[in-house]
Amino acid sequence: MKRTEEIQAESLPSSHPGNARRWAVPEAVKLYLIVSAGSVIGSVLRALASIGTLAWLGPGFPWGTLLVNVIGSFVIGFYATLTGPGGRVFAGTRQRQFVMTGICGGFTTFSMFSYETFRFVQTGSWPMAGLNVGVSITTWLVAVWLGHMVASRLNRLGGV
């Protein structure tokens, strides 16, 4: 037999606060959905950047992958520093995960970098493979450092 409270809750509209407990979404699920949404945005931006770079610079070198990974490295260095402890901008866990894990994770692509390097090796283009690895790793590290430095500078400015 149902309790009086259960019968009353069933008769309430779904938007009624009394039904909130039945429709509560666990925090972990909310975080996964937020990261997923960021990943969709990042992936679409990556596709657009790669297509645009291919049309602009041609297929001789994986410029699109290099570009998205440099931009993503800068953004994650910038955002992590700007929103980190002592940062100028407060961002909660969800916001940080949305940008850093979702958007940056969907935008950057280590797997494509690995594949493109492998293809150079497979076709005997060892100099291009070495160039790809050297230029990529160097520019990614410089970009994350620059992002960190710009955000550190902003964090020291007064105001906001």
Question: Where are each of the predicted segments found?
Answer:
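Membrane-interface helix-loop junctions in multi-pass transporters/channels
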Residues: 1-160
